[in-house]
Structure formats: structure tokens, C-alpha cells
């Protein structure tokens, strides 16, 4: 396939680009480089631009004869979205609309969309399946759900097929330790734990230890970035074979607590990793994990890496690159 990858110089995007190239696909990365890194994609063709720039999008697709689109480009800080909702709706929703229309006009008929488990909000039952209620609780989650809805109408009205992949908690790094999440912008638990391990963070805040979970701390479904990358490749293959749209959860189907993460990270790194119990954050659910049976059955996808590999690769990346790609 010949694929345009927006946000392809970012964390999940760059790992997906590497996998697609390794299997023989031709890839062009389209990225604003606000948060992306050239070092993460090597010699992959890169176009620096904004998804709202429809003439540029159409030119890139036409010049390279691209037939598929994977759309990662988005802001993703749920907390910030509560302070700056307009920023998220403008970039994530309006930017996506401009991109999809330009891609459609340029002849693209397959789209893989980077969605999120945040579209579900606080689950009433576990595990979370694709038909669970959709109640996003912040503008970030709402923006992703709106894009999913747009894609359904692009399919109905234009025949543009799409697969939305609802990720759970992305984590981990490349197996060689040479690519991972930029530690300067992280807000998720595992990279924050690693920042503390390398001395770039004084201590890890543990938000609540009185949840109805085995050790009282929050439980989440952590999925390795390489397994997410594989899910995108499988989604492209699914559309090429079946010519229809769908939505899939990408998670391991298992939850891990904050204290479990800390214990394993301390053992792996050999560092103390100071942590402090602080009050719960409003709206944080006690536990979240995926029902991934649909992706397993329909896509033939299954996670290959567990929590140990997530922590091992995260530590290798952060220990070798405590400031990310910054020299």
C-alpha cells in the first residue's frame, strides 16, 4: 500500500511508520512537527504541514500516488482539553474534517483513525466492549467521538471506508531503545515513573489509594506501542480485504494498578522512584480495561507484549534518552 500518515513523527505514529515500512509499504509522513521528531522516522519522506491545508494534502497524495490514510495528528491531553476546549475542537475535529475532505477529493478510500477509550467515559461494567455506552467526559474524548461520527457519514455518503481504533493506555518503546515517547510532554503514569527513575521528576503522584481495587490504586489497561502499530497495519489489511468500515478496541484485556507499575519499574531500573499518595482526581474511574475479543476475532490481532516488556522497553528508552531526542 501507499500510505499517508498524519502525525507520523509522533510517538505512536513513528512506531507505526517503522512497522509499515518493514513490511514493504510506501509511507509519507505529514506532520506539523509541533510535537513530532525527525529522528523518530529516519529517512521516511516528511511533509511539514497542517491538516487544514487542503491544497497541500491533495498535492502530497497526488504527487506520491497514495491510496490510504492513517490519521494520528491530534492534541491528546485530556486535562488541558478541559481548560482549552476550543483548541481541541479546532485541531482534532476541524483539522480532521479538512483532512478527510481533501483526501477524499484526492482519491483516498481507506482511513485508519487513531481514536481512544476516552470515548467511553467512566465504564458502568467491565471489560469495555465496542458496544459499551459512549459518554466522553472531556473535550478530548468528545473530539475523538465526533471524528468517528464524521467518518461514518463519509462512508455513508462517499464510500470512504474507515476503521477507528480505540486505544487504551499506550506505553512502551521500540525494542532497541532508540524510539519512545518524548519525556518533556508526558502526562501518563509509566513515562512519569520513568522520569522519576532518571531523576527528571522529584516524585510520582499516586492519585488515591482507597479505590475498590486489590491494592486500592487505580487500574488501567496498558498496551505496548508496538502492538498498537500492528493494529493499524491489520486495520488497513481488513479494509483492503473486506471493503467495509468498523471500530475496534486495542487493549490487552488486563488491568494493572499504579502500585504494580511502581513495583515493577523499581525492580527493572534498580532505582528507588519516590512516590506520594495524594487525593483522587475528580472523575477518575477505579478501573478500566478492554474487551479486545473483536479485534482478535475480526482482525486476527493480539497483543504480543505484556507489562514486563512495556516496563523494560520504557526504561531502556528513558534511561538512554532522559530528554528524548534533545541532544
Tell me the role of every PLM-derived stretch.
Residues 6, 90-93, 183-187, 222-225, ...:
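Short, solvent-exposed loop/helix junctions and linker helices
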Residues 152, 190, 229, 233:
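Short alpha-helix within the catalytic core of nucleotide-sugar-dependent glycosyltransferases
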Residues 125, 136-143, 182-190, 221-225:
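The catalytic Tyr-centered alpha-helix of NAD(P)H-dependent dehydrogenases
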Residues 38, 168-189, 199-220:
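Short, flexible, glycine-rich and Lys/Arg-enriched loop motifs at helix boundaries
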Residues 195-327:
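C-terminal substrate-binding subdomain of Rossmann-fold SDR/epimerase-dehydratase oxidoreductases
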Residues 1-173:
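N-terminal Rossmann-like NAD(P)+-binding domain of SDR-like oxidoreductases, especially those catalyzing
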Amino acid at each position: 500500500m501507499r500510505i499517508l500518515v498524519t502525525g507520523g513523527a509522533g510517538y505512536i505514529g513513528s512506531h507505526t511508520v517503522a512497522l509499515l515500512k518493514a513490511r514493504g509499504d510506501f509511507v509519507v509522513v505529514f506532520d506539523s512537527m509541533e510535537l513530532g521528531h525527525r529522528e523518530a522516522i529516519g529517512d521516511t519522506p516528511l511533509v511539514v504541514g497542517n491538516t487544514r491545508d487542503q491544497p497541500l494534502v491533495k498535492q502530497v497524495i497526488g504527487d506520491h500516488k497514495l491510496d490510504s490514510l492513517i490519521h494520528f495528528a491530534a492534541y491528546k491531553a485530556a486535562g488541558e482539553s478541559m481548560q482549552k476546549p476550543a483548541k481541541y475542537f479546532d485541531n482534532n475535529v476541524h483539522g480532521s474534517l479538512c483532512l478527510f475532505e481533501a483526501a477524499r477529493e484526492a482519491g483516498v478510500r481507506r482511513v485508519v483513525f487513531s481514536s481512544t477509550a476516552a470515548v467511553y467515559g467512566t465504564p458502568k461494567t467491565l471489560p469495555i466492549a465496542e458496544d459499551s455506552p459512549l459518554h466522553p467526559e472531556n473535550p478530548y474524548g468528545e473530539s475523538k467521538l465526533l471524528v468517528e461520527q464524521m467518518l461514518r457519514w463519509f462512508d455513508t455518503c462517499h464510500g470512504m471506508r474507515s476503521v477507528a481504533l480505540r486505544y487504551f493506555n499506550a506505553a512502551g518503546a521500540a525494542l532497541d531503545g532508540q524510539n519512545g515517547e518524548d519525556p518533556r510532554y508526558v502526562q501518563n503514569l509509566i513515562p512519569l515513573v520513568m522520569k522519576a527513575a532518571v531523576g527528571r521528576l522529584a516524585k510520582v503522584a499516586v492519585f488515591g489509594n482507597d479505590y475498590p481495587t486489590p491494592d486500592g490504586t487505580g487500574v488501567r489497561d496498558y498496551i505496548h506501542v508496538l502492538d498498537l502499530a500492528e493494529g493499524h497495519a491489520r486495520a488497513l489489511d481488513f479494509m483492503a480485504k473486506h471493503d467495509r468500515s468498523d471500530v475496534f478496541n486495542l487493549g490487552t484485556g488486563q488491568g494493572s494498578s499504579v502500585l504494580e507499575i511502581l513495583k515493577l519499574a523499581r525492580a527493572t531500573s534498580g532505582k528507588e522512584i519516590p512516590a506520594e499518595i495524594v487525593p483522587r482526581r475528580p472523575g477518575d474511574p477505579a478501573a478500566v480495561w478492554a474487551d479486545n475479543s473483536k479485534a482478535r476475532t475480526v482482525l486476527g490481532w493480539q497483543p504480543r507484549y505484556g507489562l514486563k516488556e512495556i516496563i523494560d522497553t520504557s526504561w531502556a528508552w528513558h534511561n538512554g534518552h532522559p530528554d528524548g531526542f534533545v541532544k
